[in-house]
Regions:
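RNA pseudouridine synthases
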Residues: 1-227
Length: 227
């Protein structure tokens, strides 16, 4: 592993670069040419580069870049088929009694507020079909890792595996089950014990677009995520 501009490079070959993005760093610029982003740091290291997928600013963890347009398109156009695993670790508010679970809902992003809204899996709802045609199906597997307390308040460490990759999916699904991610005030959190969003992209596995190899990457969960 190497560090360039404080961005840890997990893997690099002739086509791909996989980095470990810190929390608080945008993936790409919002329009400011001199804005510090994961993209600008990788560009300074490798030159022309293409981002394959994104993480929220406050989410840390594994992020994939392509070194050429063909590789980017090869991955993006077949992303759902190529990806074998997308695993996240999070600290949720409250005590979750279940050891594992499965969340299926429909998600919709409000174009004005940019908030993602959830529908399904409550009494009276019909998750088999969306309330409107512009809602997207989202499915998440979850597994309880540890239950504990911080300053007398209950928290639960949970691993999430994405079956679909919707915007803010884990954040919205956590709010939906009544246990927002610690530090996620946008989606209902009341506490911020770590001074950041307690969400980390810790595992990623996909089929390499050119070699056909199964690529598996892991990022250590931040040490501060302790309860």
């Amino acid at each position: 592993m190497r560090k360039k501009n404080d961005l840890e490079i997990i893997y690099e070959d002739d086509w791909l670069i996989v980095v470990d993005k810190p929390s608080g760093l945008l993936c790409m610029s919002t329009g400011k040419s001199n804005e510090d982003t994961a993209y600008s740091r990788v560009y300074d290291y490798a030159g022309k580069i293409f981002i394959v997928h994104r993480l929220d600013r406050d989410t840390s963890g594994l992020l994939v870049f392509a070194k050429d347009l063909e590789t980017k398109l090869a991955l993006q156009e077949n992303w759902e088929e190529a990806v074998l695993e997308r695993r996240y670790s999070a600290v949720l508010e409250g005590k979750i009694d279940d050891d594992e679970g499965w969340i299926e809902t429909w998600l919709y992003e409000n174009p004005k507020s940019l908030m993602v809204h959830c529908y399904g899996l409550r009494e009276g709802d019909s998750p088999q079909k969306p309330p409107r045609k512009d809602w997207q199906f989202a499915a998440t597997r979850c597994r309880t890792i540890k239950r504990g307390e911080i300053a007398g308040k209950p928290y639960t460490i949970v691993e999430f595996d994405l079956e679909t990759g919707r915007k803010n999916q884990i954040r919205v699904h956590s709010q939906w089950i009544g246990h927002p991610i610690a530090g996620d005030r946008k989606y209902g959190a009341q506490t911020n014990p770590f001074g950041r969003l307690a969400l980390h992209a810790q595992g990623l596995s996909f089929i390499h677009p050119w070699t056909g190899r199964t690529m598996k990457f892991r990022s250590k969960t931040p040490q501060k995520f302790k309860i």
